[in-house]
Amino acid sequence: MPTATNDGVAIHYEVDGPTDGEPVVLIEGLGYGRWMWRWQRERLADEYRLLLPDNRGTGDSDVPEGPYTMAAMAGDVDAVLADAGVEAAHLVGASMGGMIAQQYALDYDRAATLTLLCTSHGGEESVPIPEETAATILEVPEGYDERETIRHRMEPAVSDGFYDANPDLVESIVDWRLAGDATEAGRNAQAAAVQAFDVGDRVSKIDQPTLVLHGSADRVVPVENGRLLAEKLPDGDLEIVEDGPHLFFIEDPDHVADRIREHLFANPIEAATDAGAGGGD
């Protein structure tokens, strides 16, 4: 597996798809490993050159002492692109990954487009995680083993009935999470970056074509955050996924992949770079 280095931190990443495809970076959410993108990977790797980095603290990447910052994790993405020899790429980020993508677009100049799923620009204007969801994540029933704890904490991120309808898939997800998610220390360090993230007064400087996808039934990052984000983006396109939970891209992967393809097809990298898209201010 290729490895990039940012300020002494090793960031491992996978590459999939044709070498001549337009590069697409799939950026993980808080604590989640590369498994979270397996559905989009299956649907996009026929056409696009996919880069899937493990965030610092996650999977095969280093776990430096926290707290982390979104700026440092955006730097990790740039290190991956530099290591892979990529001058311009489409960035797709979910939840914390969407925050990293926003930070990247503000700090660096390789982002041609953004696709931001179930995310927020942070800060006081953003709508916080509901208290009930926070309690579910933090208050694990006594006696739960590691697998039961993962299922319990993930429940607010999926639709009601998802567990009952997909028992085998849920068990596979638990397996993947045990194998590739962040360590506890890494997750806590990432959570500190999310807590401190606030680009509400700068997000209007992101001029790349940006698709914002958000589930209307998101119990982790309420849908109002997607609306606020899209309103501030100069070239933002918002789609609310009706009844979609936080992990709507797992539950309805075909629709999400179709929307990503449409967005990337409408905004090819050559056109974006010719227009001078990019932050780095």
Regions found by a protein language model. Name each.
Residues L106, T113-Y144, G186:
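Flexible "cap/lid" loop of the alpha/beta hydrolase fold
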